[in-house]
Amino acid sequence: MASSKEYLEYVLEQCPEETASRAMMGEYVLYYREKVFGGVYDNRVLVKPTPSAIGLMPDAPRELPYDGAKEMLLLENLDNREFVKELLERMYAELPLTKKRKKTERKENHENPDYQ
C-alpha cells in the first residue's frame, strides 16, 4: 500500500523546517539538512537505527520498510514536535552525506533518421 500525500504533509508539519521529501515508488524518502534519515512507508515513519535514535527510542519497534530492506525504527511519537526535532538533530551527525545523483548524458543516435 502506498503512503498518502496527506500523511506525508502531516509528517512534514511535525518535522523541523529543514526537512524535505522525495517520492520513490509510491513511498517517500525523508531528508534532514540534505541527509537521508528515514522515510514514510505504508503511512508509517521509519528512521535509520543510528546510535542516537536507538538511545532516544530504545523500545521502538523495528520494522521493514519493504521486502529485502534493513530494519528501521518506527517513530511512534510523531505528535511531539520537540522530540522529533531533538531526534533529527542528534541523528544528523551520524548520518552519511547524501550522494549527488549524476545526470545521464543523452547519447546521439546518428543511425536513426528521426533523431534531431
Named regions from a protein language model:
Residues M1-Q116:
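Charge-dense, helix-prone N-terminal extensions
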